[in-house]
């Protein structure tokens, strides 16, 4: 039996394989960019925010509801002490809250109270108030499936903006602030209520 000589891939075959790999890389890059730039969709956009009445994290004997927040816009920010992305965005959220453009309400989701309080003590508390939903039942009405998730609700109680994922300065400047400005300049908008110092 004679051994046939070993055949090496032809330059044409190598070029074809490289072309396919480049095409796959370009498609992946394009899909990732379109995913990053896709608008945040929520079935709640343009609709009344779901009713809620939840205990305050710092004093569970007190409750806060969406009717308590009516009359002025507020940002409802869903977070958990177990959420790495929440810790990453905390400095950005704190900086935004200091601007006092809108009330920032924390929504502690699927968390133990002790862990959440310790997390706020370590990383800072940018919130006017923090509600607690340890079982995550009320969050289901909002369509929350992950933290962090952020909603902007106008003074009439309508959900105007939704973002799933960590906030950064670019998202705040290019997505959140234009909608907030629209709310502030709307003839039917309630006057903005700023956070307490």
UniProtKB/Swiss-Prot annotation:
It is a single-pass membrane protein. The chain crosses the membrane at residues 12-32. The keyword Membrane applies. Keywords: Cell inner membrane, Cell membrane, Cytochrome c-type biogenesis, Disulfide bond, Membrane, Redox-active center, Transmembrane, Transmembrane helix. SUPFAM superfamilies: Thioredoxin-like. One of its GO terms (molecular function) is disulfide oxidoreductase activity. Disulfide bonds join 83-86. It is found in: Cell inner membrane. Residues 1-11 are cytoplasmic. One of its GO terms (biological process) is cytochrome complex assembly. Signal peptide: none annotated. Its main location: membrane. Residues 33-197 are periplasmic. InterPro entries: Periplasmic_diS_OxRdtase_DsbE (IPR004799), Redoxin (IPR013740), Thioredoxin-like_sf (IPR036249), Thioredoxin_CS (IPR017937), Thioredoxin_domain (IPR013766), Thioredoxin_ResA/DsbE_sf (IPR050553). GO terms for cellular component: outer membrane-bounded periplasmic space; plasma membrane. Involved in disulfide bond formation. Catalyzes a late, reductive step in the assembly of periplasmic c-type cytochromes, probably the reduction of disulfide bonds of the apocytochrome c to allow covalent linkage with the heme. Possible subunit of a heme lyase. Belongs to the thioredoxin family. DsbE subfamily. This is Thiol:disulfide interchange protein DsbE.
